[in-house]
């Protein structure tokens, strides 16, 4: 259960870092300072989101597991009960 959550967070962090790297201008010092402030704010928000995501339990996972197991259950019922 921890791997998908951490993978999701890693994808977001990599996506944000890539977009910030591409958007950073090199010639304008004011724009560089603004980009640095934006990067720091994004890093802080990402850290808060990670802490919040790791602190909360996932109430939807049992329901999601049930929904993903329905085709398997249907196949088992058809194979064992209906077709004998």
From Swiss-Prot:
Free-text tissue specificity from the UniProt record: Expressed by the venom gland.
Q: Give the GO cellular component terms, alphabetically.
A: extracellular region
Q: List residues traversing the bilayer.
A: none
Q: Signal sequence: where?
A: 1-22
Q: Could you tell me one molecular function GO term of this UniProt entry?
A: sodium channel regulator activity
Key words of the record: Amidation, Ion channel impairing toxin, Neurotoxin, Secreted, Signal, Toxin, Voltage-gated sodium channel impairing toxin
Domain of life of the source: Eukaryota
Q: Where in the cell is it found?
A: Secreted
Purpose: Toxin that potently modulates mammalian voltage-gated sodium (Nav) channels, reducing the voltage threshold for activation and inhibiting channel inactivation. Is selective for tetrodotoxin (TTX)- sensitive channels. Shows activity on hNav1.6/SCN8A (EC(50)=285 nM), mNav1.7/SCN9A (EC(50)=352 nM) and hNav1.7 (EC(50)=403 nM). In vivo, causes spontaneous, gradual and long-lasting nocifensive behaviors by intraplantar injection in mice, as well as noticeable swelling of the injected paw. Does not have effect on insects (blowflies).
- Family of this protein: Belongs to the formicidae venom clade 1 family.
An additional note in the Swiss-Prot or TrEMBL entry is: Negative results: does not show activity at hNav1.8/SCN10A (EC(50)>1 uM) and hNav1.9/SCN11A (EC(50)>1 uM). Does not exhibit hemolytic and cytotoxic activities on HEK293 cells.
What protein does this entry describe?
Myrmicitoxin(1)-Pm1a
Q: Which organism is it from?
A: Pogonomyrmex maricopa (Maricopa harvester ant)
Tell me the organism's taxonomic lineage: Eukaryota, Metazoa, Ecdysozoa, Arthropoda, Hexapoda
